[in-house]
Amino acid sequence: MADGFPWLTAIILLPLVASAFIPLLPDKEGKLVRWYALGVGIADFVLMCYTFWHHYDTSSATFQLVEKYDWLPQIGFSWAVSVDGISMPLVLLAGFVTTLSMLAAWQVNLKPRLFYFLMLVLYSAQIGVFVAQDLLLFFIMWELELVPVYLLVSIWGGQKRRYAATKFLLYTAAASIFILIAGLAMALYGDNTTFDIVELGAKNYPLALELLLYAGLLIAFGVKLAIFPLHTWLPDAHGEASAPVSMILAGVLLKMGGYGLIRLNLELLPDAHIYFAPVLATLGVINIIYGGLNSFAQTHMKRRLAYSSVSHMGFVLLGIASFTDVGVSGAMLQMLSHGLIAAVLFFLAGVTYDRTHTMAMDNLGGIGQAMPKVFALFTAGTMASLALPGMSGFVSELKVFIGVTTSDIYSPTFCTVMVFLAAVGVILTPIYLLSMLRQVFYGTGAELSCNINNGAYQNQEDEGTACFGTDCLLPGEAVYRDASVREVFIAVSFLVLIIGVGVYPKIATQLYDVKTVAVNTQVRQSYTQIAQSNPQIYAKGFFTPQIVEPEVMAVSGVIK
């Protein structure tokens, strides 16, 4: 705890406590509540920036801003929160994306009080997941975010919104059981019953137990990260969710899966990671290629972007499995980069939908002439997504490629195959993204059409029209208006960071590199010990049997 003030607790509770006052606001039309929610979001993000600027040391790999209060001491459960190089950048990402998503939902007119209440609760839950140092608290926060997401999709979604929301809830809730089981198993193992992540990392688990725990956690986090074949909830959720909710789904919620893999699977179960790493690498290239091929087959704009996210998350898996400092760093940067890029693309897809009231790309075409600002911003976001040099996506994918190529644990043959297959996915990316640009913005096809009784807008027949942009008009008033000042501001806010990180990656990497090096050192140390005790454990020609002894020791991802 810095200076005796509970900074992280304040960051978590501010949106949650503020949401409780929304029913008391004298606001019938929802105009006051949107300013209130946006103000809370900005205040919390400013509080994050102030806290990390003044009280966080980027040169340290240890947990910082630690707060711990006994909650149920009989079972070792406490309110324990802290941040390190893995969690701190993701906390900032969550605050940035969620605040801008509330600004993106400026025109919501269907139950605005409930909408912004759920957004603020979701804000708190996301932060709680990333800062929880107690594994049971991590699980509670993980479950807490399910409720607002389910309601946000099922109430403000498209025609099949209830199906998509239920599918998301069932997938995530069922998978999260593995987090609870793994947490209980680790907490109850040995003489010391505790859920504290630092203390759990100090325990010496049998290899068989580690493998079981790793497999269970991989399923739980694989669902959230949209790893094939656990990804099928994602296209449905994105296809039916409103643009502001899709921004959070793609920008923050997917990253919870990657964060969980690094925090629990790598840090707490490094021995099991030695056995599962080639599985992660294989799943990574499957995600990259499968997501790219499926994305190209989609005619629904947001479903195409959803499968694009599946493809990009494959690079996170590949980097985590690389056993190299640069590879793990690339995985972290890919999560941050994709969070920004996916959020701006889903937002701009929503802006386009507000004008055309269709996501079917076959029904669009030529709207770039009528909406040049939207066209320019969408093009910039697309260039970032296909990893154009100068954009953040290029740096993150390049680091992952270098990490896999230079890995001294995998054989040259394995590295070559992985890099080649991943490169195929990289080639697919401009194909499906540039074709989307062509279908939507080029040509002369699209006729003015704004029929709320057709397509994805049919869902609002019985509940009124829910708008998420400035130009959501009735059929008789339909026009293609260009982006408003508010919409340009949101998109440019994302693009400035995307280009900034692409031009000078150290802006982001200096926040976490010390920590990722420590985590990778710990994993490589485990590999050395296992390879020395059982050199025949790896298939010949698939791995190299030995690596150089690490120069530093690491315990629970902290350099000793």
From Swiss-Prot:
EC main group: translocase
Catalytic reaction(s) noted: a plastoquinone + NADH + (n+1) H(+)(in) = a plastoquinol + NAD(+) + n H(+)(out); a plastoquinone + NADPH + (n+1) H(+)(in) = a plastoquinol + NADP(+) + n H(+)(out)
UniProt main location, coarse: membrane
GO biological process: ATP synthesis coupled electron transport; electron transport coupled proton transport
Localization, UniProt: Cellular thylakoid membrane
Gene Ontology MF terms: NADH dehydrogenase (ubiquinone) activity; ubiquinone binding
UniProt keyword annotation of Secreted present: no
Cystine crosslinks: none
Signal peptide: none
Superkingdom assignment: Bacteria
Membrane topology designation: Multi-pass membrane protein
EC code(s) of this entry: 7.1.1.-
Sorted UniProt keywords: Membrane, NAD, NADP, Plastoquinone, Quinone, Thylakoid, Translocase, Transmembrane, Transmembrane helix
Gene Ontology CC annotations of this record: plasma membrane-derived thylakoid membrane
Chain segments annotated as transmembrane: 5-25, 35-55, 86-106, 114-134, 135-155, 168-188, 208-228, 242-262, 273-293, 310-330, 331-351, 374-394, 417-437, 488-508
InterPro entries: NADH_Q_OxRdtase_chain4, NADH_Q_OxRdtase_chainM/4, NADH_UbQ_OxRdtase, ND/Mrp_TM
Job description of the protein: NDH-1 shuttles electrons from NAD(P)H, via FMN and iron-sulfur (Fe-S) centers, to quinones in the respiratory chain. The immediate electron acceptor for the enzyme in this species is believed to be plastoquinone. Couples the redox reaction to proton translocation (for every two electrons transferred, four hydrogen ions are translocated across the cytoplasmic membrane), and thus conserves the redox energy in a proton gradient.
HAMAP family: NDH1_NuoM
Similarity remark: Belongs to the complex I subunit 4 family.
PANTHER family for the chain: NAD(P)H-QUINONE OXIDOREDUCTASE CHAIN 4, CHLOROPLASTIC, NADH-UBIQUINONE OXIDOREDUCTASE CHAIN 4
Name of the protein: NAD(P)H-quinone oxidoreductase chain 4-3
Organism: Nostoc sp. (strain PCC 7120 / SAG 25.82 / UTEX 2576)
